[in-house]
Amino acid sequence: MKKITVISASILLLAAAGSYAAPKKQKPVKIGIAKIVQHQALDDVERGVIDAIKDAGIEAEYDLQNANGDVGTAAQIANQFKSKKVDAAVGIATPIAVALATTLKTTPVIFGTVTDPVGAGLVSTLEHGERNITGMSDAIPTEQHIQLFKEVAGIKTLGYIYTSNEDNSASALELVKKGCREAGIELVTQSITKSDEVKQAAEAIVNRVDGIYLTTDNTVFSAIASLVNVFGKANKPIFSGDVTAAKEGGIFMASGFNYYKAGRATGEIVVQVLNGKKCAEIPVRFMTDPSDSDFLIDLDAAKKCGITVDKKYIDSANMIYQNGKLTKK
């Protein structure tokens, strides 16, 4: 009887020890992140997504993909994420987000920097997500930008280059048209389908306009250096809705949100989803806080274009490019 009691006690002790053993380490979640093309702004979004997830204490394995501006490649990436059974997929820019949403019917799809998610068919309303889809919009105040460009640079004819086969750019074009009508400015447009055409498009309109306005067209920004070179030689000003590219010099004025912060905002949505919240319950997020935005004036470019910038604009800018150097206030 004593032997049985000792054996029973030993079993109980082992059971108790087992109950206090360290829990098994959970497997890292699998997250696919794809961008339509590589340029600094989208790289910043990607970095922000990853940092937000890391800061939330979530261990993750990433499959990072770049479609190189090709819609067919975007579809292949979506199928790759499907076969790998990722726990969540992030689409940076409209074409890749649409490809993911088309292919992944049950996997959470979080889009980042999509100008018009309703127009792109990703969601039916901005009030909440759609089934397994939600995300962050990079809509910018186009009409205000055009009015500001007119006030500061005195332009009467405005150039605009857009990607004709990208939903994001088609939506932006309508806003540019509206902004020009309201400001009483003539609009000259040139369409492209790939980054190789950006320089040729810039050359086609540079002598017909007083300046050019850039929205967040990813194909244009993937070849931004060639456009800046063309307009720089002609001493014509550039206004950009993306501040990232302007930090290298040559772009007269830029106003837009910080893309790294936009990436973090997108990553925070991913964290919500990984923690159990349904995409359909999460509204589309916008970067509306003033601290999310930057305003840059390039005084070197202004001087080259013969533009005198009023002190009130210089005072309101949080970044000044002068004498080949960027200064942050």
Roles of regions detected by a PLM:
Residues M1-I4:
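Positively charged n-region of N-terminal signal peptides that target proteins for export
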Residues I11-S19:
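Hydrophobic h-region of N-terminal signal peptides that target proteins for export
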Residues A21-K329:
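Short hydrophobic alpha-helices and adjacent helix-cap/hinge residues
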